[in-house]
Amino acid sequence: MNFPQAIIDASALRHNLQRVRELAPRSQIMAVVKADGYGHGLTRVADVLVAADAFAVARLEEATALRQAGHRCPVVLLGGISDKEQLQLAAAHRLTLVVHEFAQLDLLERVRITSPLPVWVKADTGMHRLGFPPQVVAKAIARLRCCPAVASVVGLMSHLASADESEDFLTPIQLQTFEGIAAPGLLRSMANSAAVMVYPYAHFDWVRPGLMLYGASPFAHGTGAAVGLKSVMTLQTRLIAIHHLRPGDSIGYGATWVCPEAMTVGVAALGYGDGYPRHAVSGTPVLVNGRPVPLVGRVSMDMITLDLRTQPKAKVGDPVIAWGPNLPVEEVARHATTIPYELLCQVTGRVPRTME
């Protein structure tokens, strides 16, 4: 195949889930598979991560897709619901809701459903995105416990804003706030991937790993391999053209890169239309025949151009890897001034995923 494909390593997924268990042995695992399993394929990933204790998604459509694929474990809808139709659909699929504002609570009190739902309550401990202010959490819990649409209030959760930052002053404050919220009898959940790795006292009853399941590090200067994770996605393609250029020849849109000498370049079938970052700069590493070569010129919609001076025997059809076990997605993200989350999630639908 001369076009891009994403190879998904099932054994690496299972390994990374086990790594979470090793780091948080006393916690249950809510595997975060939102955004199409971080670009790896929602149901494909869930089928491999069946040993997780629950799944977490952001959208109702993701949750129903898991149910339709046959998954019967708890599926937690992190964003909750916003109207009667969504609530009824959530009830029909036996989902677990996150309730993070009073409009959702009002809806649960107003609408009658035949199958009451378990809920988590979300508190805003400092990220100021979703969640009840700490001082009203007890009131929200009390109302939910009296609500006919609520089967049970399972637990209290919050989200860490900067656990992945090297100079993180906020996480201890958030944890102190979280622990100060009165929620007797409720399970607790706070830890994302970064906190699973470096804040064991944030593990509580449930951890919510996302990025680390897919083998990447949430830390700006780290790699998943450095903490015992295995890369799950290999984004690969092939060379589709070889050119022998002269000194002064320019490459790509805008003629932004000029050949310093007579040299060979290769064109690979991969571009921003496939999810490769358009802002990857010249010098971004790409593997040709397993060896690194630099990207040169701008990324096009369907193609990238590579400096083959260190690969004089490269030919049309040779394999090209944009990221994978031997070229961390974190490194590519740094060259594109972005984060691995974005690179994995933005691999487009025209790139076929193959589980191996």
Swiss-Prot record:
SMART domains per record: Ala_racemase_C
Keyword Metal-binding: no
Membrane spanning residue stretches: none
EC primary class: isomerase
Active site: K34 (proton acceptor), Y253 (proton acceptor)
N6-(pyridoxal phosphate)lysine modifications at: K34
EC number(s) recorded for this UniProt protein: 5.1.1.1
Pathway: Amino-acid biosynthesis; D-alanine biosynthesis; D-alanine from L-alanine: step 1/1
Cofactor(s) needed for function: pyridoxal 5'-phosphate
Domain of life: Bacteria
Catalytic reaction equation(s): L-alanine = D-alanine
Biological processes, Gene Ontology terms: D-alanine biosynthetic process
UniProt entry keywords in alphabetical sequence: Isomerase, Pyridoxal phosphate
NCBIfam families (alphabetical): alr
Function per UniProt: Catalyzes the interconversion of L-alanine and D-alanine. May also act on other amino acids.
Family the UniProt entry places it in: Belongs to the alanine racemase family.
Protein name: Alanine racemase
Organism: Nitrosococcus oceani (strain ATCC 19707 / BCRC 17464 / JCM 30415 / NCIMB 11848 / C-107)
